[in-house]
């Protein structure tokens, strides 16, 4: 393998929309996810929706639509 061509692999914080944070390894600085094992219905056994608020939601909010 060539030296100096691979990205740096480091420990980063993974942040969920429910507020849960945990460490993982990645080449990115920060990772954001919509669901994790703390809020996913399969693991919790109950129904819960986390609102991520995407581009369409921001547009509608900005221009007072819906």
From Swiss-Prot:
Zn(2+) binds at residues 16, 18, 36, 39. Binds 1 zinc ion per subunit. GO terms for biological process: translation. GO terms for molecular function: metal ion binding; rRNA binding; structural constituent of ribosome. The keyword Lyase does not apply. Keywords: Metal-binding, Ribonucleoprotein, Ribosomal protein, RNA-binding, rRNA-binding, Zinc. The keyword Ribonucleoprotein applies. Its cofactor is Zn(2+). HAMAP family: Ribosomal_bL31_1. Binds the 23S rRNA. Part of the 50S ribosomal subunit. This is Large ribosomal subunit protein bL31. It comes from Priestia megaterium (Bacillus megaterium). The gene is rpmE.
């Amino acid at each position: 393998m060539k030296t100096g061509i691979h990205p740096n692999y480091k420990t980063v914080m993974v942040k969920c929309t429910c507020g849960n944070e945990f460490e993982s390894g990645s080449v990115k600085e920060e990772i954001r996810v919509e669901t994790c094992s703390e809020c996913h219905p399969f693991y919790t056994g109950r129904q819960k929706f986390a609102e991520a608020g995407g581009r369409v939601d921001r547009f509608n909010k900005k221009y007072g639509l819906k």
